[in-house]
Amino acid sequence: MASNPLAPVTEKIADGVWRHAGDIRQGMNVYLVAEEDGSGVFAFDAGTSAMAKSIRSAADELGGLTRVVLGHAHVDHRGSAPKLGVPVHCHPDEVEEAEGDGGVSYQPLKDIPVTYSRWLYKVVFPIWDGGPVSITGTIAEGERIAGFEVVHLPGHAPGQIGLWRESDRLCLCSDTIYLTDSTRPLGHHPGIYPPHPVFDQDPQQTLESVRKLAALEPAMIAPGHMEPLRGEPADLRRRLEAAADQRTGW
């Protein structure tokens, strides 16, 4: 990783897939995925508003940015989308949020159990956001994008999706899981965490989506935040199921 905690980094994580990590501690992930026709790369998720320039630069090194596919439309995932000048797609259940003002009605930040985090998120959410996104088209469960299958993983957001590639058992899963405790963002508390209920549209559905991810038996999970998680498929399945069953960390 770069020594500057704000400097974006780009790394290849799999065939035709690059992780572009930016913003604070390189904690916001945008995945650049090669288009099958060789026309460039598309972005899965769009990070924060401040990442627009670095996303464009990284994509240009890989043939150019063709489109954005939102894993979901929270402000730290849609942030740069209005600035990138390419078509933006999302799940039908996420269009309203993507085109809205960035105020998520189902996230009562006052209920975050760690006091400093309540204030921190209130400050950074408006900074991360780039404003409403004009959605060009929608994508749904079972559709295919550049060799990946769209998987609906609702709960954290109603229209959250992942991209699954069976050939190497790779899942780009947006915020289906966190690999640190999001209620304590100033520290690093490694583990597999379903998003805290305060961040979810439907906490029970979130756990069902974690189990759905587990059932895929991935060998690599590429989340919306932190570095990818790699392992034996059976072991990752066990760990994901345990996280859903125990809601690890809460």
Named regions from a protein language model:
Residues 119-146, 200, 204-212:
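Alpha-helix-centered segments that form part of catalytic cores
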Residues 37, 60-64, 143-146, 166, ...:
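Glycine-rich phosphate-binding loop signature in dinucleotide/nucleotide-binding domains
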Residues 6-60, 163-179:
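Conserved beta-strand hairpin/beta-sheet module of binuclear metal-dependent hydrolase folds
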Residues 50-137:
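Active-site HxH/HxHxD metal-binding segment of metal-dependent hydrolases
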Residues 103-108, 220-250:
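C-terminal/domain-terminus segments
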Residues 48-49, 141, 149-154, 158-232, ...:
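Metallo-beta-lactamase
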Residues 42-44, 69, 88, 170-172, ...:
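Residue-level marker for buried hydrophobic side chains located in beta-strands
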Residues 17-23, 44-48, 65-68, 148-152, ...:
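Short, flexible loop segments at the rims of nucleotide/cofactor-binding pockets, characterized by
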